[in-house]
């Protein structure tokens, strides 16, 4: 992939990465209360995997870096078994298996992703304002 052409491209890439993160978290929260008839079928929380991309020579003044989502993986957590013999999804022993989503953890992650998105948006907006003022000075 070619590097960003300007600060707006860099902001777009960073905001896109945070959107992947927020969409994954939203999916986790939506499936938090789900149950299944076996541990294999139970919903497992997911997390995006990010990769840092550098544009220019690392260590040089003016080197740009951003991150991008390269994959979404399931967390390695075992679903909790609950004894609910009257539940329609209960197995032969009367157990259902709950999703591995921790709603509090997901909400903290969502808040962090939202703030990172907002910070990037503010940086891009500030850069746009500075560019506009610079152009206005030349008139």
Predicted regions and their residues:
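Amphipathic alpha-helical polymerization modules
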Residues: 1-139
